[in-house]
């Protein structure tokens, strides 16, 4: 009986989840709206809150389920949020196994950070002349 109730509750929570519930910076929420995302995917619902809270996570999901946004949105959130400690602040380095994936990640990062000040993305790949 408890398991059935828990599954029902989880299903209900997933149906009602919005990006506003994920504690992201208002500018990030605006970028999500401009990107046309209606609601977070399952991987985003599970990963974003944990990453925003400062946890390290390891997650996997099928292609096309929103994994890139699941790690990029909290990274951008952290970059534009006021620092809690003194210092130069956070920086982000994303490593990708293929050139195509690196370019896709940069494209998504540019889309989400379009209206954010002082955010610069650079894609560096090997094996090609510059």
How does the language model describe each region?
Residues 13-60:
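Conserved pre-motif I regulatory segment
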Residues 30, 34, 85-130:
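Conserved nucleic-acid-binding Ia/Ib motif block in the N-terminal RecA-like helicase ATPase lobe
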Residues 61-65:
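The conserved Walker
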Residues 23, 27, 42, 46, ...:
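Charged, alpha-helix-enriched surfaces in structured cytosolic catalytic cores
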Residues 48-57, 69-86, 110-113:
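Walker A/P-loop NTP-binding motif
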Residues 38, 58, 76, 80, ...:
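Nucleotide phosphate-binding site architecture
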């Amino acid at each position: 009986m408890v398991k059935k109730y828990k599954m029902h509750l989880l299903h209900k929570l997933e149906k009602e989840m919005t990006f506003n519930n994920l504690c992201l910076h208002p500018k990030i929420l605006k970028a999500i709206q401009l990107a046309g995302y209606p609601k977070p995917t399952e991987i985003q619902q599970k990963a974003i809150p944990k990453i925003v809270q400062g946890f390290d996570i390891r997650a996997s999901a099928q292609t096309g389920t929103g994994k890139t946004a699941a790690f990029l949105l909290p990274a951008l959130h952290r970059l534009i949020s006021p620092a809690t400690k003194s210092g130069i602040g956070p920086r982000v380095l994303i490593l990708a196994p293929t050139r195509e994936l690196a370019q896709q990640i940069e494209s998504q990062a540019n889309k989400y950070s379009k209206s954010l000040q002082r955010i610069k993305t650079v894609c560096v790949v090997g094996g090609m002349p510059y």
